[in-house]
Design a protein with these regions (language model features):
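HotDog/MaoC-like acyl-thioester-processing domains
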Residues: 1-14, 100-140
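A generic structural signal for short beta-strands and their flanking turns/coil linkers
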Residues: 21-23, 31, 84-93, 107, ...
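Predominant activation on well-ordered alpha-helical scaffold segments within soluble catalytic domains
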Residues: 33-36, 67-71
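Catalytic strand-loop segment that frames the active site of acyl-thioester-processing enzymes
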Residues: 2-61
Length: 140
């Protein structure tokens, strides 16, 4: 997915507009296990298919794994201010993990520009969600 390059004076015209969704990404057990190792979060619902099955039908991804993936998925179709040298993560608001993401789910990110503030050149806020099944699983 291509990035969209925008002149600073055009940023306001993107408020309320959705960007192209990211590519689909499969959340397989290897990715979940690697995240468990990196974060030292080996709760059985993430890493033990047999124990997790009666509760969720399978293992589920860590909520923070889904959240962490938004960084890379957001880069696929980012809104880039012309002349900027880089972008930084300013933070997230109102993060909610709305539904589990079962192993082997496919997720992607939908981004919508909700506000433009001239705090610093090229700085704006986005609302994003990660969807893998029939409903949004992550809102931030």
């Amino acid at each position: 997915m291509p990035m969209t390059f925008v002149k600073p004076e055009e940023l306001d015209s993107y408020v309320g507009k959705s960007l192209e969704p990211s590519e689909w990404l499969t959340i397989d057990q290897e990715r979940i296990n690697n995240f468990a190792d990196a974060t030292n979060d080996h709760q059985f619902i993430h890493v033990d298919p047999e124990q997790a099955a009666p509760i969720f039908g399978s293992t589920i991804a860590h909520g923070f794994l889904s959240l962490s993936l938004t960084s890379g998925m957001g880069e696929e179709n980012a809104l880039v201010v012309e002349g900027s040298k880089m972008s930084l993560n300013y933070g997230l608001d109102k993060i909610r993990f709305l539904a589990p993401v079962p192993v082997n789910s496919r997720i992607r990110m939908h981004s919508k520009i909700v506000e433009v503030k001239e705090k610093n050149p090229g700085q704006f806020l986005i609302k994003s969600g990660a969807r893998g099944l029939r409903k949004t699983s992550l809102y931030c």
